[in-house]
Amino acid sequence: MNAEQLVAFETEIAELFNAGKIAAPVHLSHGNEENLIRIFKDVRPQDWVLCSWRSHYQCLLKGVPPEELKAEILAGRSIALNFPKYRILSSAIVGGVLPIAVGLGMGVQLSRENAKVHVFLGDMTAETGVAHECMKYVQNFNLPVYFHIEDNNQSVCTDTQKSWGFVSHTDRFSYNATKYPHAGAGERVQF
């Protein structure tokens, strides 16, 4: 899937949301397509991918068919998409997938399975205690878990750098999330 296809899918979801066809929250992406495509070149079918509530692009890049993904979103599950047969899981709980990723990494290592675990988290989630503990555990036990921090410079509606006041020491990619608000698609839709 290329960047144009990702954007077209997300645009369709935004239109459906604004038309009141999705009676649940949606968290849409825009501007991070090329970064994710680059990362997913190294993600294999046997690898696990874990994400936060903003996971439409990751699902598509992991191989979930667009119509299957769209059906789950229309059913109100946009922020907790789970497709075990494609080895992709997400959660609306901030940092909720991080300990699961560590557990999957332990399982992969113990079973000697030829798989990796890729976990995507936001810039503010990366500053939580659970994130630091999970990253340290992965490092200490040499688990096959890779953390991808998606830094859109905002945590909900707060500028992340202003709220934390520090210089980052982690490997991140950054993008401007200017097309969509934190939740929704720009129109106020009553459920």
Whereabouts are the PLM-identified features?
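Cofactor-/ligand-binding subdomain signature composed of acidic, glycine-rich
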Residues: 1-25
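Membrane-interacting alpha-helical segments
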Residues: 6, 83-86, 156
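Acidic-residue sensor for enzyme active/binding pockets
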Residues: 10, 33, 150
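Cofactor-binding active-site loop characterized by glycine-rich and histidine/acidic residues
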Residues: 14, 21-141, 162-166
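Thiamine diphosphate
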Residues: 141-191
